[in-house]
């Protein structure tokens, strides 16, 4: 790579005066980043465990976002600002994001039910999240977010406490990097298994009878069972 010395000018972002290169965000992804940092152990399994444990209990916030002087109000599960197209580990939060187009891809995810969670997980892995009805997306260079109270944000997965008003902007072609032009996409076996398992879960949930769908407590129990089975399979994976 160094011998070839292929240099590209890439964009980077700044959130709350802190630079980021792939993604930053506010809401559930920032909340999980904070829990992950405090978990005492690292690794994909810890991240998935925290996500499954906290996902159904998390309370979405209401956000006022300003883009190019226009204000809009949303209740959102998360707001992700992407320079690159994924969080990492093949989880694509903004499949069309490009690190050299001079724009941030913003993905806003509305609150969703527990029955919708497996489908959202699948779509994050197979790059089809933009087709989900809970998703709003747009491009911009500058975004101002106002929430109800101060709280955690994240930059490239690292958590940080911030005020209730957060500013995010993109710096076009602000960094020069040596890149590998021969890099091939790679799907880790663990991630492949996780995606396949959630596909099985989604099929099971889609066949639940009307009585179970009407009974929230029973549905919640089944989802909890699914989560425990997922963690069991992950722990058995070499």
Task: Describe the residue ranges of each PLM region.
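Catalytic core of DAGKc-family lipid kinases
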Residues: 1-77
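Short beta-strand-to-turn element immediately C-terminal to the catalytic PLP-Schiff-base lysine
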Residues: 15, 33-35, 81, 109, ...
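Gly/Ser/Thr-rich active-site loops/lids in small-molecule metabolic enzymes
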Residues: 38-46, 95-116
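A generic structural signal for short beta-strands and their flanking turns/coil linkers
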Residues: 59-61, 75-77, 100-105, 139-141
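Glycine-rich, charged/polar anion/phosphate-binding loops
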Residues: 8, 48-52, 61-68, 89-94, ...
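ATP/nucleoside-binding phosphotransfer catalytic cores, i.e., glycine-rich phosphate-binding loops
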Residues: 67, 73, 98, 108-238
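Glycine-rich phosphate/pyrophosphate-binding beta-alpha loops
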Residues: 25, 29, 80-94, 159
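A residue-level signal for conserved active-site and pocket-lining positions in enzyme catalytic cores
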Residues: 13, 32, 79, 106, ...
């Amino acid at each position: 790579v160094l011998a070839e010395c292929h240099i590209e000018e890439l964009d980077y972002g700044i959130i709350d005066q802190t630079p980021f290169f792939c993604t930053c965000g506010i809401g559930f992804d920032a909340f999980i980043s904070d829990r992950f940092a405090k978990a005492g152990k690292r690794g994909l399994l810890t991240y998935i465990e925290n996500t499954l444990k906290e996902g159904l209990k998390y309370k979405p916030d209401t956000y006022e976002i300003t883009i190019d002087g226009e204000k809009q109000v949303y209740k959102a599960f998360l707001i992700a600002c992407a320079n690159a197209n994924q969080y990492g580990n093949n989880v694509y939060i903004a499949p069309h994001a490009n690190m050299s187009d001079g724009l941030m891809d913003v993905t806003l995810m509305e609150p969703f039910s527990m029955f919708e969670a497996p489908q959202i997980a699948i779509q994050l892995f197979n790059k089809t999240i933009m087709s989900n009805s809970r998703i709003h997306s747009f491009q911009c260079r500058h975004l101002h977010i106002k929430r109800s109270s101060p709280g955690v944000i994240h930059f490239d997965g690292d958590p940080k406490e911030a005020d209730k008003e957060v500013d995010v902007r993109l710096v076009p072609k602000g960094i020069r990097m040596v890149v590998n032009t021969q890099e091939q996409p790679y799907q880790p076996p663990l991630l492949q298994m996780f995606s396949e398992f959630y596909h099985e879960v989604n099929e099971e949930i889609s066949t639940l009878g009307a009585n179970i769908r009407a009974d929230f407590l029973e549905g919640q129990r089944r989802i909890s069972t699914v989560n425990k089975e997922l963690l069991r399979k992950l722990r058995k994976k070499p």
